[in-house]
Amino acid sequence: MYRVTIVYNHPADPAAFDEHYSSKHVPLVQQIPSVKRFAAGKCDSLDGNPPSAYALAQLYFESKAEAGQAFASPEGQNAAADVANFASGGVTMLFTDEETVLP
């Protein structure tokens, strides 16, 4: 599987981020073609210190080529363009050809 991880830095207004993300951004992401799995959540820490990032999302595809086609599609472009509407802290995107080490 090919994984795209989007790391969202801490936004200026967390409540506005949460509202826009759940009501507007998630529906756009759900329209991206070829996504096999979409997982997201707010970051936490084991020691109680503030996490280094606010939230992250992971999109899984069969291959790197599928991921590229999905993000180049109109639906992928719409979702990417929407990020500027709520992610005031910025984002980092990570791309991984995932290998399962343990079942």
UniProtKB/Swiss-Prot annotation:
It comes from the Bacteria. InterPro entries: Dimeric_a/b-barrel (IPR011008), EthD_dom (IPR009799). GO terms for molecular function: oxidoreductase activity. Pfam families: EthD. Disulfide bonds: none annotated. Residues 12-88 form the EthD domain. This is Uncharacterized 11.0 kDa protein in thcB-thcC intergenic region.
